[in-house]
Every structure is written in structure tokens, then in C-alpha cells.
UniProtKB/Swiss-Prot annotation:
GO terms for molecular function: serine-type endopeptidase inhibitor activity. SUPFAM superfamilies: Ecotin, trypsin inhibitor. Belongs to the protease inhibitor I11 (ecotin) family. Pfam families: Ecotin. The gene is ISP1. This is Ecotin-like protein 1. Transmembrane segments: none annotated.
């Protein structure tokens, strides 16, 4: 089994940012190209009232993909809004002073090609958290026209 190596000279994190590096399990070149995708899900863990937590929150933001010059290695830069947007439904009539912590993510995070040969390198704000998902599709199917 081969593992990715951190050989490319990835940039250092800028002030107010952190760099997260992780490896993806090898799936085979053909499967990685045709069946797998990586979804980066940046967000923040926010403290809020129970009523606010029952509503749907999102953090505006963007994920930009960059390439290490001369290496072809990809890395990602995340920008997140400072404040979350929220629905405004009144849900609980109980004490609103009770606080809970909730992960609030960027809405509709994009999918990126799955590449296990290089590490996944992501730069994001110091107070942000990164979660990710692996999407796997089956065999391609063709729609029939009438």
C-alpha cells in the first residue's frame, strides 16, 4: 500500500490562519478518477441559545483551489464569514439562557477530485474547523431517450 508524501513546498499559514494536512486512503487510480470525490466542509463551532440552535444556520464563505508552482500539488484556501446567517423560527418556550455548542458549516460545500497521491492541504481561519466527506459513485448509467 502506498501513502502520500509531503514533498511539495506548501506555503506556510498566514497570520490568523492555520494549516490542516491529512491523507486520503488509496482507492486505485481508475476508481479515484471515476468514482470518488472529496467534499471539504469548513465551519465553526458556535455557542448559541437552544432556540437559535433549533434553527438552521450557515456560514457564508468560499473554498479556492490553488497549485504549488512547479509541483502540480493542489491546496485549498478557505474564507468564512464572521457571522452566521440563520432562520428565525421560534421553537422553544423554555429558558433561553441555556447555551449549546453547534457546528455551523458553509452551505453547499463543493466537491473536488479524490487524489490519494498527495496530501490534502487546507488553510482556514484559526477559529474554524474542517470536516470532510468522501463521495463514492457506482458504475455510470446512461439515460434512455424516448
Amino acid at each position: 500500500m502506498s501513502y502520500c508524501k509531503i514533498e511539495a513546498p506548501y506555503p506556510t499559514a498566514e497570520a490568523g490562519e492555520k494549516r490542516i494536512i491529512f491523507a486520503l486512503d488509496p482507492k486505485g487510480d481508475e476508481a479515484e478518477q471515476e468514482q470518488y470525490m472529496l467534499q471539504l466542509i469548513p465551519g465553526r463551532v458556535l455557542e448559541m441559545s437552544r432556540n437559535d440552535a433549533a434553527n438552521h444556520q450557515t456560514l457564508g464563505g468560499s473554498i479556492e483551489q490553488h497549485t504549488v508552482e512547479g509541483w502540480g500539488a493542489k491546496f485549498f484556501h478557505v474564507k468564512l464569514a464572521k457571522q452566521a446567517a440563520s432562520t428565525l423560527m421560534h421553537v422553544h418556550d423554555e429558558d433561553h439562557s441555556e447555551k449549546v455548542r453547534k457546528f455551523v458549516a458553509m452551505p453547499n460545500p463543493p466537491l473536488f477530485p479524490y487524489r490519494s497521491r498527495c496530501p490534502v492541504v487546507v488553510y482556514l481561519p484559526n477559529d474554524a474547523e474542517l470536516r470532510y466527506g468522501i463521495w463514492c459513485g457506482g458504475q455510470q448509467m446512461q439515460a434512455v431517450t424516448e
